[in-house]
Regions:
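N-terminal helix-turn-helix
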Residues: 1-90, 249-257, 272
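Hydrophobic alpha-helical membrane-association signature
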Residues: 15, 92-95, 240-247
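Amphipathic alpha-helical effector-binding/dimerization core
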Residues: 65-66, 70-166
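Intrinsically disordered, low-complexity polar/acidic regions
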Residues: 171-172, 203
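Extended hydrophobic
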Residues: 177-248
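Short, highly charged C-terminal tails/helix-capping segments
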Residues: 257-274
Length: 274
């Protein structure tokens, strides 16, 4: 597909990747003007690239008339596939196994997948009393520790769009079953930097989650521990944070190579257009 007339295909690919990188890393939404200025592209060129990328589902226009652009569903799907790549998942599984050894409870790595939480990896504890959720399982956003963490750390426009589509189902008598209560909880999570599911999804189960963030502070995954409240009562939830945060930093490092390559690609494309 020739996105820009009169330019070599390799140059077009580099520019398209640079635009995708700018949108993916731009926070809530990125305007055409900001993308053009950031990459040193003429506005008509940037617009043609964005239009073609939008037609491919890689970007989409932000809501509420902002005129900006956000990652599209196809780009989100590709990102998820990369995160599941076997080459990096081996290192992440080893980190997760060490975390289970340290805490003595089941731990998992999750990502945001549309309007649900997807289990990327999971290592079970040796305890006979535990909950079995295999990698590939999906759970709700509004009543799980990882889900609430993702919601709390999303840009406001995207969070509002997701919450507007949510059905607030009550799973236990502790589930936050209305948006106002959930919004208060999300504010606490943003302030504290971690999330707790205190029997909100499954009675008798407590879960603590912390973010795995890239170099810009964007949440790319979550790492969590879960255990029966008989072994991990709510008042002991904070005791798991040092180990969880060490694991989160180690997990973030497994993404560094890919993020560095993307940044170099973006810088190269930008230099080539000036």
């Amino acid at each position: 597909m020739n996105l820009v007339r009169g330019k070599p295909a390799s140059s077009v690919v580099q520019r398209a990747l640079a635009v995708l990188d700018a949108v993916a890393r731009g926070g809530e939404s990125v305007s055409l003007a900001a993308i053009a200025a950031d990459l040193g592209l003429p506005k008509p060129t940037a617009y043609r690239l964005l239009r073609e990328l939008a037609e491919a589902g890689l970007v989409r226009r932000a809501t509420e008339g902002s005129g900006g652009f956000t990652p599209g569903p196809r780009l989100e799907s590709l990102a998820l596939a990369v995160m599941q790549h076997a080459g990096s998942s081996t290192a992440r599984h080893a980190i997760l196994s060490r975390l289970v050894d340290e805490l003595g409870e089941t731990c998992n790595i999750t990502v945001l997948d549309g309007s649900q939480v997807l289990y990327l990896d999971r290592v079970e504890s040796p305890w006979p009393l535990r909950v079995h959720l295999q990698p590939g399982s999906r759970v709700p956003l509004t009543c799980t520790a990882s889900g609430k963490l993702f919601l709390a750390r999303l840009p406001k426009l995207r969070r509002d769009r997701l919450l507007a589509q949510m059905r607030f189902e009550r799973h236990t008598d502790r589930t936050l079953a209305d948006r106002a209560s959930l919004e208060q909880e999300l504010e606490r999570i943003r302030k504290n930097g971690f999330a707790v599911d205190n029997e909100e999804y499954l009675a008798g189960l407590l879960c603590v989650a912390v973010p795995v963030s890239d170099s810009r502070g964007k949440t790319i995954a979550a790492v969590a521990v879960q255990a029966p409240v008989a072994r991990l009562p709510h008042e002991r939830a904070r005791s798991t944070l040092p180990a969880l945060e060490r694991a989160a930093r180690a997990l973030a490092a497994t993404y560094d190579t890919g993020l560095t390559r993307a940044s170099r690609s973006r810088a190269s494309a930008s230099r080539g257009t000036r």
